[in-house]
Amino acid sequence: MGFRNVVIKDSVFLVNGQPVKVKGVNRHESHPETGHYVTPEQMEEEVRMMKRANINHVRCSHYPADPYFYYLCDKYGIYVQDEANIESHGYYYGKESLSHPIEWMPAHVDRIMAMVERNKNHPCVIMWSLGNEAGPGQNFRSAEKMVKARDMSRPTHYERNNDIVDLGSNQYPSVDWTRSMAGNK
């Protein structure tokens, strides 16, 4: 059993009041020998390799992981950024994005809230990611409000739609953008 409190204060990520430098990886459920089926033993070896490599964070790319993976992350102390299975970047970020039409709102909200309900009791989950590269529309605004109404204990994340979440990211930064963010350090 574990407990955690996650706060972002003055751009510092705090877990249980302690600053944490997140050192993470993206993880897809796949294995070179078994394909998209990963055995419990293979999952455990993955998590143990992460610990040996001083990795403390996993982003579930681009869908929630097998339930056993969360058990292992709870057991070994790996932080998880849980990501909803919403990826529609074939429509990318324009007005064609499925994140805009109101008729797609129930699908967005349902997928995100299903992830939250399924994994809300895992202390390893330190952040809810609304999805991946699926546009900046109103459907994500609605879903983020639903997440916060259900769980205020974790920050929310989404790629590029940074104005609606607690922690945004730019997964394809230009060299100039990266330099400007680094402040020539």
Where are these regions (language model features)?
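Substrate-binding/catalytic cleft of secreted carbohydrate-active enzymes
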Residues: 47-53, 57-185
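N-terminal carbohydrate-binding accessory modules
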Residues: 1-50
